[in-house]
Amino acid sequence: MNPEHSPLGKATVYAAQYDASLLFPIPRAGAREQLGITSALPFFGTDIWNAYELSWLNARGKPQIAVATFYVPAESPNIVESKSFKLYLGSFAQTTFDSIDAVRDTLKRDVSAACGATVSVQLVSPHDFGKLEMEELDGLSLDRLDLDTDVYEPDPSLLKAAEDEAPVEETLVSDLLRSNCPVTGQPDWGSVQIHYVGPQIDHAGLLRYIISFRNHTGFHEQCVERIFLDILHACKPVKLAVYARYTRRGGLDINPFRTNYNQPMPDNARNARQ
């Protein structure tokens, strides 16, 4: 489905009852073809969605709430357009469910069907809210660098690496990632963590490259995949992982993770801006 046909940027009608048809899938293939991905994926990973505005009614009509986390595999053929996801979750508000397990099962079934792959779902109920973590991405901050730049569209030529020197292992972070929704033009603000093993990447060039997304239009997942591929091609690391955490919009935050080697799933801990 084309993003222009999604609910984004259109007048909103909120459903009075649960409605799975509100979910609007968008194929990943189109954006990936623009990146030169036409066959096997050069990465694997997950899109972590956190939903903070989930509520339903119990059998006695009393509202219930939970924080939901969805783990969408990167190999799924579709993503779900975020406003449609918000409207879908909103449709639970006046619908009765017998238990939190019934809510979880319904979410898993519907979102998996929309994405075309098995999506894991976790629900945190209010008595466990205190266990939800908040921390910043670990790594050496690129934002400490004092530099000039005037490039605000993605430019991989900014990426340089010391290919003639011994390989290094580094984890680098920046809070200066910004891209824009391709349908509404609204800015998406994010933090990004880059872990790699290989020729040392020039820090100033990498920060300028991250800043260069500032006027770019693309969904969160597409931007992270572009960052991953540009670094992979320009700097030739042996191992590479890119993890971004975007600020919340419409009660949802989206946190894509891409890697080319086996490693544990990153922590799903909110940062200060989320």
From Swiss-Prot:
Intrachain disulfide bonds: none
GO cellular component: cytoplasm
Domain of life: Bacteria
Subcellular location: Cytoplasm
A GO term for molecular function: preQ1 synthase activity
Active site: C181, D188
Keyword Cytoplasm: yes
Pathway stated in the Swiss-Prot or TrEMBL entry: tRNA modification; tRNA-queuosine biosynthesis
EC identifiers of the protein: 1.7.1.13
Biological role stated in the UniProt entry: Catalyzes the NADPH-dependent reduction of 7-cyano-7-deazaguanine (preQ0) to 7-aminomethyl-7-deazaguanine (preQ1).
Assembly, per entry: Homodimer.
UniProt family annotation: Belongs to the GTP cyclohydrolase I family. QueF type 2 subfamily.
Protein name: NADPH-dependent 7-cyano-7-deazaguanine reductase
Organism (species): Burkholderia lata (strain ATCC 17760 / DSM 23089 / LMG 22485 / NCIMB 9086 / R18194 / 383)
Gene designation: queF
